Amino acid sequence: MLKIQEMMQIALMTAIMGILGLIPPIFFTFTPVPITLQTAGLLLAGGLLKPKQAWMSLLLFLLIVAAGAPLLSGGRGGIGVFFGPSGGFLLAYPIAAFVISWWLNRLKKMTALRLFAVYALCSIGILYICGVPFQAMMMHIEVKQAALLSMIYVPGDLIKAGICSVFTVKIIQAMSYRKREIHKGGRAI
């Protein structure tokens, strides 16, 4: 059974994913998969939540999108988005968030550099392993060709991984400080 605080964290991360969907995507003429900031939300979910919570927040987000809410970048929503070229990437979101969180929970010390490595490996590795073959199938092209088309996204994914790793460390430090203040009798504002 989830605690209320855990449910709130799941809901908050789901809302953040929806808010990031309001930022317009960047499309290229040669590939139908857009560049979005929602992968940054995936990274933050994995970095800030427990594995089960991270998985649940992204699954909840995808269920809301499947129900028709236009929360994906560009106002996309509905079950049809999962049968398009970006469907494999989307379906990999909960898996990637879970693996990121699971991996980070096993680190003895969390630094921005270690976070960056985990974020980059998981976001590029898991999302592309699931997304590229699905994209190839939907576009009726070879997997090798889809992989080459997807290489345009790697620099942006690395930039997002770097920015999110710094944000995650700062958020965790702020939360740890806040917890110390509460335990000392300070006010939680």
Model-derived features: where do they sit?
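Generic alpha-helical transmembrane segments of integral inner-membrane proteins
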Residues: 11, 15, 19, 40, ...
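Hydrophobic alpha-helical transmembrane segments
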Residues: 7-12, 36, 40, 44, ...
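Hydrophobic transmembrane alpha-helices
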Residues: 1-55
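Short helix-perturbing small/polar motifs within transmembrane alpha-helices
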Residues: 19, 79-127
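Interfacial aromatic-anchored transmembrane helix boundaries in multi-pass membrane proteins
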Residues: 21-34, 62-96
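Structural signal for the C-terminal ends of transmembrane alpha-helices
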Residues: 48-49, 99-107, 170-176
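N-terminal leader/targeting helix
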Residues: 48-75, 182, 187-189
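Membrane-embedded alpha-helical hairpins and interfacial helices in multi-pass inner-membrane proteins
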Residues: 75, 109-185, 189
